[in-house]
Swiss-Prot record:
Biological process per Gene Ontology, one example term: secondary metabolite biosynthetic process
Gene: rdc2
Residues bound to FAD: G14, A17, E47
The protein's name in its UniProt record: Flavin-dependent halogenase rdc2
Residues noted as binding chloride in the record, renumbered to the chain: S324, G325
Swiss-Prot/TrEMBL keywords: FAD, Flavoprotein, Monooxygenase, Oxidoreductase, Signal
């Protein structure tokens, strides 16, 4: 079968975001073509899934297949950010630790089984646009470069061609063809420029051996505050072990070991700074190379436009501390499917549908960015009680938002509690070691734009975030008013997703009727 000359919806990229979007849209009877530049199975890091994946897979009838595959069940995880404190999430609800080459291929094949025409080894090189004739203003996380109408592709066997389409889903990963080549709107978070090294081990000591939490993921902050380490047990008998640290501190560490220091040596030094993980690995054997990759966090000023949607890493990426990447990819893919189908069905205008998608993606990024910033700051400060009250020696409250109940819908109060916690953390940082300039805390009156911490107000929180992590102007809005209030936390049911109204539109998650309702 060859790539067709035209389709209704072109999905560029066959990773989790693209495959999920293609499956959801094809199941609605749409003519969908999915093009993946690589060949499955292909390696990818990012093995630890959140419980929110299960209801998302359930919606496209894929949960049972994932469950039957034999992936390591993830009943929870522990986060030890300082030398004294340990927090966890679970055990209500579960997810999996996956081998991404296997899980990504399952998703890709499911898109084909759902009715999408799926091709591998096909790369999108360029996109053609034409003017969009209807009113479509820039702003509010959307952009109008024109309407994409066709794409030029090439294959690994040397063939090439063009494919025309009515809608485009950009799921091209960090390449992000729309953001980087056409919109040129990707912005890096200067405070979250990290570098990761990782490898795979066998014969380690399971974490929490002999307890109900045995062999669950474990994350530990380095004692020098440079970053954090992970251990994620996999069903193939290996354990994924890695370290994430600020890029400048990584090279400082490498320099201290000598100019010829290898990543294996650097990993060994990181394990010394994560003593619990170091003990777990004492009898273990490294069975892979130590890999390295930049781990820069970024976002964009727009995630949609006339007849196109941007999903997953093609739009935004955050430090992987809370397994955010895969969740944002799949949740964003569902948002793309909902909004495109709504546009096709005439539930609303294309401008309204695309703006809904863009804001939905931005909200997910916002929630994770807020908590990741607070967690990383705790790691860097170590003994200062940023993520726990002075009289509390645990992080359970901090990670409550990662503990979905099987049938519980998150309320405004639930989300507000999470936000209040993060605001409390940021304000503690100010009390500990920050001198906030007056001009950074001027702005909205307390309480006007949402939840406050009781005395400082949202504008001060925005200033704290800007000072704390050198946020871009766009990212300062993350804490400016805390507009997440009433939006869905990453939870255990699709009610969290479906029950959220944006600009008077709510998602309608019914097979055969996927779209948006006006409320």
């Amino acid at each position: 079968m060859s790539v067709p000359k035209s389709c209704t919806i072109l999905v560029a990229g066959g990773g989790p975001a693209g495959s999920y979007a293609a499956a959801a849209l094809a199941r609605e009877g749409n003519d969908v073509v999915l093009l993946e530049a690589d060949q499955h199975p292909r390696y990818h890091i990012g093995e630890s899934m959140l419980p929110s994946l299960r209801p998302l897979l359930r919606f496209i009838d894929l949960e049972d297949k994932f469950d039957a595959h034999g992936f390591q069940k993830k009943l929870g995880a522990a986060f030890k950010l300082t030398s004294k404190r340990e927090g966890s999430h679970g055990p209500r609800g579960y997810s999996w630790n996956v081998v991404r080459s296997e899980s990504d291929e399952i998703l890709f094949n499911h898109a084909r089984e759902s009715g999408a025409q799926a091709f591998q080894g096909i790369k999108i090189n360029a996109i053609e646009f034409e003017p969009y004739e209807e009113e479509y203003p820039n702003g509010e996380k959307v952009a109008n470069p024109g309407k994409p109408t066709s794409a030029k592709w090439s294959s690994k066997d040397g063939s090439s061609g063009d494919i025309a389409f009515k809608y485009l889903v950009d799921a091209t990963g960090r390449i992000g063809i729309m953001s980087t080549k056409y919109l040129k709107n990707r912005h890096y978070n200067e405070g979250l420029k990290n570098l990761a090294i990782w490898g795979y081990y066998k014969n380690n000591i399971p974490w929490a051996q002999g307890t109900p939490r045995e062999n669950q993921p474990f994350f530990e902050g380095m004692r020098d505050g440079a970053g954090w380490c992970w251990t994620i047990p996999l069903h193939n008998g290996t354990v994924s072990v890695g370290a994430v640290m600020r890029k400048d501190l990584f090279f400082e560490k490498k320099k201290s070991l000598g100019e010829n220091a290898t990543n294996t040596q650097i990993m060994a030094e990181c394990m010394k700074l994560c003593p619990t993980i170091g003990e777990l690995l004492a009898p273990a054997e490294l069975v892979s190379d130590i890999k390295q990759a930049t781990d820069y966090s970024y976002s964009a000023t727009a995630y949609a436009g006339p007849n196109f949607r941007i999903v997953g890493d093609a739009g935004c990426f955050i430090d992987p501390f809370f397994s955010s990447g895969h969740h944002l990819a799949v949740a964003g893919a569902l948002a793309a499917a909902v909004s495109i189908n709504a546009s096709i069905k005439g539930d609303c205008t294309e401008y309204e549908a695309s703006r809904w998608h863009a804001k939905k993606v931005d909200e997910g990024y916002t929630l994770f960015l807020l908590v990741v910033m607070a967690a990383l700051k705790q790691i860097r400060m170590q003994e200062n009680p940023v993520l726990s009250d002075v009289d509390e020696d645990g992080f359970d409250r901090a990670f409550q938002f990662l503990r979905p109940e099987a049938v519980k819908k998150f309320t405004k109060e639930d989300v507000a509690q999470t936000i209040d916690f993060a605001v409390h953390a940021l304000n503690n940082m100010a009390e500990l070691d920050m001198d906030i300039p007056e001009h950074m805390i001027n702005g909205d009156k307390e309480g006007e734009n949402g939840v406050t911490n009781g005395n400082n107000g949202a504008a001060k929180t925005a200033g704290l975030a800007s000072n704390m992590e050198k946020l871009t102007n766009d990212e300062e809005k993350v804490l400016n008013g805390l507009r997440i209030l009433g939006k869905a936390a990453p939870g255990g049911t699709l009610a969290d997703f479906e029950g959220t109204a944006i600009d008077g539109l709510m998602p309608r998650l019914e097979h055969g009727k996927l779209g948006l309702n006006k409320v």
